[in-house]
């Protein structure tokens, strides 16, 4: 009986020691991952994306460079409305981040006097429309822009998510 007690005690000490050794010898670093995997941005803005715990070089790329571009340091630039994926590639694995850019179907608009164009919001719904100068161009609640007289102005829209997006409007002088 006494022999069994010593054996159990010895076994318990060995298990506890082994468990402590495992805890302290393991790395405390987390797994490699992107700082974000889903991002919603407004056209014209930028944001830094990070690949955490990455070892070695990281190669960044965009699935659609017309919507979102990315530089070699992981800074992403929202160019126009749409959806694209940013990829961060290491030697071992590729990581993806979905980027949704809220914007208009046109970022700049040139309209002749009395002409109309319908601006459409991509990846959101319009809540309220504004014209920077109603003497140059007006906008309806449906996003229809009408050129009034020559000049430059900005048409803005507040989306349902609270984002403000803008379109520059130019109405040229008509030469007779």
Task: Give a label for each model feature.
Residues 12-23:
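Bacterial N-terminal signal peptides
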């Amino acid at each position: 009986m006494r022999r069994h007690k010593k054996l159990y005690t010895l076994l318990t000490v060995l298990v506890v020691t082994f468990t402590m050794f495992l805890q302290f010898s393991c790395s405390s670093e987390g797994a490699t991952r992107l700082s974000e995997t889903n991002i919603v941005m407004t056209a014209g803005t930028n944001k830094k994306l990070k690949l955490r715990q990455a070892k070695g070089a990281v190669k960044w790329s965009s699935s659609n460079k017309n919507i979102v571009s990315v530089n070699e340091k992981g800074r992403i630039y929202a160019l126009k409305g749409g959806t694209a994926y940013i990829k961060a590639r290491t030697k071992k694995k590729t990581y993806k981040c979905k980027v949704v850019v809220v914007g208009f179907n046109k970022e700049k608009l040139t309209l002749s006097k009395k002409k109309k164009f319908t601006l459409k919001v991509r990846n959101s719904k319009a809540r309220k429309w504004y014209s920077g100068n109603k003497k140059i161009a007006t906008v309806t609640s449906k996003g229809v822009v009408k050129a009034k007289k020559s000049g430059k102005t900005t048409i803005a829209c507040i989306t349902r998510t609270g984002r403000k997006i803008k379109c520059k409007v130019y109405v040229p002088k008509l030469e007779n």
